[in-house]
Amino acid sequence: MAPAKKGGEKKKGRSAINEVVTREYTINIHKRIHGVGFKKRAPRALKEIRKFAMKEMGTPDVRIDTRLNKAVWAKGIRNVPYRIRVRLSRKRNEDEDSPNKLYTLVTYVPVTTFKNLQTVNVDGN
């Protein structure tokens, strides 16, 4: 049997989820909307991008930039791009009466090719 853990051994450090950070990701939309009907593809793609941002950044408040919306809808409701490069920025909420201290802003990053792209941390600017 594994030894029992003692209750009072928690570290008192800042959680990384409270840090303000910006990262660039490539999202494979194609696998996320596989099997979705034609008239629901672009709306579902935006929902999946929102879900991805929620999972990666850990904030329930996700805001999608209008340029990203236009990029997803550029080829119509049916023909959504296979992949998309996005910048996720976890930011402090200026609105005091909001229940969430942080929100995630998702912006579009235009790229010519998706070959050899990694997830990268971007300096906060």
UniProtKB/Swiss-Prot annotation:
Modified residues (Phosphoserine): 15, 98
Physiological role: Component of the large ribosomal subunit. The ribosome is a large ribonucleoprotein complex responsible for the synthesis of proteins in the cell.
Keywords: Acetylation, Cytoplasm, Phosphoprotein, Ribonucleoprotein, Ribosomal protein
Gene: RPL31
Pfam families: Ribosomal_L31e (PF01198)
UniProt cross-references to Gene3D superfamilies, sorted A to Z: 3.10.440.10
Residues carrying N-acetylmethionine: 1
CDD domains found in the cross-reference section: Ribosomal_L31e
Record's protein name: Large ribosomal subunit protein eL31
Lineage: Eukaryota, Metazoa, Chordata, Craniata, Vertebrata
Top-rank lineage group of the source organism: Eukaryota
Native species: Pongo abelii (Sumatran orangutan)
